Structures are given as C-alpha cells and as structure tokens.
Amino acid sequence: MIQMQTELQVADNSGAKRVECIKVLGGSHRRYASVGDVIKVTVKEAAPRGKAKKGSVYNAVVVRTAKGVRRKDGSKVRFDDNAAVLLNNNGQPIGTRIFGPVTRELRTEKFMKIVSLAPEVL
C-alpha cells in the first residue's frame, strides 16, 4: 500500500536508488497504490553516472509492496520492501535490467517488458 510521501527502492538500473511517491495516479482523490499501479515519483537518491538524476520526476510502476497482494485462491504474496520501476513517457522502463522478484499481477499488456526482464516472477 503506497501513498504520498512513501519512499520506495528502485528495482532497475536506471541510476536512481531511492524515490518518493508524490502522487498516486488514476482518479482524482485516489489515496493508495498497490502492485501494478502507476505513481508519480521524484528521485531522492541516485547513482553518480546514472540516467536518472536527483530531483527529477518520473512515472513509476509499483512492483513489490510490504503490504502484499492477495490472490484469488486466498494466498498472499508479501515482500520485505516497497519497490518500483521507473518509466519513460511512453510507459516503457528506463532501465535495461530488473533486480529482485516481481509479481504475476504485472503480467498485463502494458508491463510485459518488466516481467520478461525480471529474474523471478512470483
């Protein structure tokens, strides 16, 4: 469950290390985002020679949450951290690698690239 001012780890090699959610996209008063939702983030910490610079604003898709995702069979998938993947204006990932597992809920037409780059899909 991600809301405004939540800090997330970045699960790609775009150069950003840590980002902060500044808006949950999709609806005028939407409060929370979960896995697969797109949020607006600002970069709080970045690698020296990465594509993403500190202070820049991007769209990102949430790939892991500590709150977890409930499946239709009653099981729940939780993670140790909250993580996101930065997106460009076309909705494609900025990085060329994804670190850590992602959930099967990302397997939609928009985010198949992220699922194919991920080392593990839960």
UniProtKB/Swiss-Prot annotation:
One Gene Ontology BP term is:
translation
Keywords, ordered alphabetically? Ribonucleoprotein, Ribosomal protein, RNA-binding, rRNA-binding
Please give one Pfam family short name. Answer: Ribosomal_L14
Any one GO molecular-function label of the UniProt entry: structural constituent of ribosome
Which PROSITE patterns does UniProt cross-reference here?
RIBOSOMAL_L14 (PS00049)
Q: Which GO terms describe its cellular component?
A: cytosolic large ribosomal subunit
Name the InterPro entries for this protein.
Ribosomal_uL14 (IPR000218), Ribosomal_uL14_bac-type (IPR005745), Ribosomal_uL14_CS (IPR019972), Ribosomal_uL14_sf (IPR036853)
Q: What does this protein do?
A: Binds to 23S rRNA. Forms part of two intersubunit bridges in the 70S ribosome.
Assembly and interaction partners? Part of the 50S ribosomal subunit. Forms a cluster with proteins L3 and L19. In the 70S ribosome, L14 and L19 interact and together make contacts with the 16S rRNA in bridges B5 and B8.
The UniProt similarity line reads: Belongs to the universal ribosomal protein uL14 family.
**Protein name per its UniProtKB record:** Large ribosomal subunit protein uL14
The record lists the organism as: Francisella philomiragia subsp. philomiragia (strain ATCC 25017 / CCUG 19701 / FSC 153 / O#319-036)
